[in-house]
Amino acid sequence: WAPIFDRYVISKLGRRRGWILITQVLLIFSIIGLGMTNPAMNAANVALLAIFVTFFSASQDIVIDAYRRESLSDNEQVLGASSYVLGYRIGMLSAGAGGLILADLMSYQFVYLIMALVMIGGVLITLIADEPVNFSEPSTFLDAVRNPFVEFFKRHGDSINNNISIPILILLFILLYKVGDTMAHSLSTNFYLEMGYTKTEIGTVVKVFGLMATLVGAFIGGLLSIKIGLYKSLISFGIFQAIATLGFSVLAVSAKSLMLLASVITLENLAAGMGYTAYLAFIANMTNKQFTATQFALMTAIMSLPRTLFSGSSGFLVESLGWENYFIFCSLIAFPAL
């Protein structure tokens, strides 16, 4: 549904801020409604409201991605991606940990209400923010659906040795860049448990060290990408991610050690934060500002495909290879993208 956000301007706030405001308001009411619904009495209503929350949340993400892309120049996309990762992770921690703490003190209805009211801050920011310079929207909805594809392939329409299509290579890179990291993470909790770590140890070490390392990685990744350039950063951070993934293989053959676990988690999340920052900036730079919402949404959908396509086979690979060799495989599979 991303072409809707490229095609229609429905508010005096502009094409981007108008849609951001609408999705935020609808999301607030959906969260409040979800909190006020009793699952035991109205399971169907809970399911419907959960769908609304998911839909409006995804819609907000699409338009905010477009807003960030259009508000920043190509050279500023790395810092924009770094700020996005920092804010997103802090928001996840605040909502997740904060929600659990509040749930011990009050009913879940009030927790949902508080979470919804916190979003009013985002509404206020939307109202006072500047609208990015608008390009002319597509003349018809069909153009909004078709033209982003046509424009992307025309803009990158060259080929290598008249054989390999550059647009296809770009899409394959987006698909494969994080595949090793994604596969390693897909079974990480099962791996920690099998290695003898308790759920408390996993929750404490992984959440605390992992979050802090991701935040630091996003910050460092943004600075280094500006210093050495985006494309060198993608290669360097990709190699770092592959090396960091090997830390899980070390865990697999080592005795239980919280210090070793914390070290591996820190290194892996540091690399992931650096790689993700450069990766998002690359995707942003591949979009045309006239079709930002549609092209960005399509590329991020491709980015998330490995989680669906490859994670399902991870269990079978572990049974066949064992944990040590599985993580070596996850490390090696990252190199085709590089």
Question: Which residue ranges define each predicted feature?
Answer:
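C-terminal ends and interior cores of transmembrane alpha-helices
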Residues: I20-A40, I239-K256
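C-terminal transmembrane helical hairpin of 12-TM major facilitator-type secondary transporters
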Residues: Y231-Y279
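Juxtamembrane intracellular "pre-TM" segments in multi-pass secondary transporters
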Residues: E131-L169
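Helix-to-loop junctions at the C-terminal end of transmembrane segments
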Residues: W1-G14, V216-S233, V318-E319
